[in-house]
């Protein structure tokens, strides 16, 4: 920002797949410094690496850790060995809380394709819930059922496997958008051909 002489208010952070963890970390760091970006867009994001890997399937077909689900203690042991957790959900809870406390500005957009075979689209639900918990200021006191009902009320369906959920509070907006098809090659670029649809 200083080198290019561009204010944060004119910068949008964009992260895709593993890059969403980096964008989340950058947003959290600068939020703690009192700096708000024009927006943050996370495409195919995930709540944390251990959570995502617990449901990860190669090409959408080969569930890497499925055999370990029969022994939850073993799955927990394997996942506990992950050094870098990339806990984006925790980061967004804290970032939203920090921005809210100082009456700052937040624009977070979560974009995912239902047929993304690398990162399950449900991972965005965790990011959305975490950011909302940071905004409402009750942290973990917002129970799942209440949050789900409130999210449903703020959601517009765009057909099968497609919706937009928007949470607005003062100058803070968290938006989650699900598309039925796209995966990573086509969701962001419009290019690439992804022929396998689930």
Spans of features found by a protein language model:
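Gly/Ala-rich beta-loop-alpha elbow adjacent to hydrolase catalytic centers
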Residues: 15-19, 23
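Residue-level signal for short, function-critical loop segments
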Residues: 17, 44-46, 114
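Hydrolase active-site cap/lid region
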Residues: 25-97, 126
């Amino acid at each position: 920002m200083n080198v290019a002489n561009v204010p944060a208010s004119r910068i949008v952070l964009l992260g895709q797949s593993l890059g969403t963890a980096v964008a989340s970390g950058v947003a959290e760091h600068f939020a703690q410094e009192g700096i708000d970006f024009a927006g943050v867009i996370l495409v195919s994001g995930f709540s944390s690496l251990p959570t995502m890997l617990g449901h990860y399937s190669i090409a959408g077909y080969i569930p890497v850790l499925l055999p370990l689900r029969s022994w939850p203690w073993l799955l927990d042991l394997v996942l506990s060995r992950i050094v870098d957790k990339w806990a984006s959900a925790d980061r967004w809870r804290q970032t939203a809380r920090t921005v809210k406390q100082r009456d700052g500005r937040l624009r977070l957009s979560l974009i995912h394709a239902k047929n993304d075979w690398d990162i399950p689209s449900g991972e965005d639900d965790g990011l959305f819930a975490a950011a909302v918990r940071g905004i409402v200021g009750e942290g973990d006191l917002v129970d799942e059922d209440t949050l789900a009902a409130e999210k449903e009320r703020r959601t517009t369906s765009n057909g099968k496997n497609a919706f937009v959920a928007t949470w607005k509070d003062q100058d803070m907006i968290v938006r989650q958008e699900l598309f039925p098809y796209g995966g990573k090659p086509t969701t962001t670029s419009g290019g690439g051909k992804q022929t396998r649809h689930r």
